[in-house]
């Protein structure tokens, strides 16, 4: 397989995927096997796109095209392909496109990943578990904390053709969390597949934190949310956003909710401007698409 790309008018780059993965390198052998299985199954069209967005799951795959439309962009017109990796397997594919190395394919690549804050107890044999942004570094005497993809974000920050983007390091968690955090008053998000629909809608109608918390049903998960947010030093505005985002995150199924949200957001966009409800694309996705399409 030989891949020809033209990143600049009049310039031709030649990529040789076969020679990128070294047979005497164990990591490369594993990566090559994964890439071969993946491409044989569904994704050979990535070689024909001008630019690529690698995502971890179906929610990003379904929502990115409509997010682009809200930014007055069209991924199809820009020949951008969204590739769902089905997990955190970016490293296997980035070897194909890393232009710091010879024989690679010169395409602009964005990798979208969740920041996923997590913590583990300062005790032997403990594992990291997911935590909320407002719990991060709140109890350093008893927990260690970390974010996902710190290494990758730094590694590719100045790369010629690859970038990693994720949610805000202070307030972010996942795509679904950020959608609600940046749209805390947007009822478009309350699709039929959202459980606890009436509860979240009632919370949205309140501005006072105590009144919002009073709308939440009793559960261990909700008690943790309320206790942790109450201990946070964030502003009331950020606490309100976080409370709604946490409740929303725990009430959605990624695939079905993303499909319904895609339909609802497109229908909103198709209305006359005066009739549209306000919706904000999560900022990390705005940043990613701005870089990719520049």
Q: Where are each of the predicted segments found?
A:
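Acidic, divalent-metal-binding catalytic cores of TOPRIM
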Residues: 9-294
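Structural recognition of the conserved hydrophobic beta-strand(s) that form the central parallel beta-sheet
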Residues: 1-5
């Amino acid at each position: 397989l030989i891949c020809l790309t033209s990143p600049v008018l009049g310039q031709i780059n030649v990529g040789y995927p076969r020679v990128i993965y070294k047979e005497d390198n164990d990591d490369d052998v594993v990566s090559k096997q994964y890439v071969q299985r993946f491409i044989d199954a569904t994704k050979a069209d990535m070689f024909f796109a001008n630019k690529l967005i690698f995502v971890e799951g179906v929610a990003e795959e379904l929502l990115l095209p409509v997010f682009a439309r809200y930014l007055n962009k069209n991924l199809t017109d820009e020949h951008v392909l969204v590739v769902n990796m089905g997990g955190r397997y970016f490293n296997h594919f980035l070897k194909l496109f890393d232009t710091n190395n010879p024989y690679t394919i010169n395409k602009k690549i964005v990798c979208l990943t969740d920041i996923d804050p997590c913590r583990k107890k300062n005790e032997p044999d403990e594992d990291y578990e997911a935590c909320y942004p407002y719990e991060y570094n709140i109890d350093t005497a008893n927990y260690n904390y970390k974010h996902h993809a710190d290494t990758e974000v730094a590694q590719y920050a100045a790369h010629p053709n690859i970038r990693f983007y994720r949610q805000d390091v202070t307030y972010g968690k996942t795509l679904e969390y950020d959608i609600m955090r940046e749209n805390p008053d947007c009822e478009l998000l309350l699709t039929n597949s959202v459980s606890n629909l009436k509860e979240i809608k009632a919370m949205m109608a309140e501005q006072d934190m105590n009144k919002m918390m009073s709308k939440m049903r009793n559960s261990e998960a909700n008690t943790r949310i309320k206790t942790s947010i109450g201990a946070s030093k964030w502003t009331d505005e950020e606490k309100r956003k976080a409370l709604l985002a946490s409740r929303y995150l725990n009430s959605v199924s990624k695939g079905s909710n993303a499909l319904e949200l895609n339909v609802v957001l497109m229908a909103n966009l198709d209305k006359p401007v005066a009739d549209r409800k306000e919706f904000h694309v999560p900022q990390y996705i705005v940043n990613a698409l701005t870089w990719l399409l520049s």
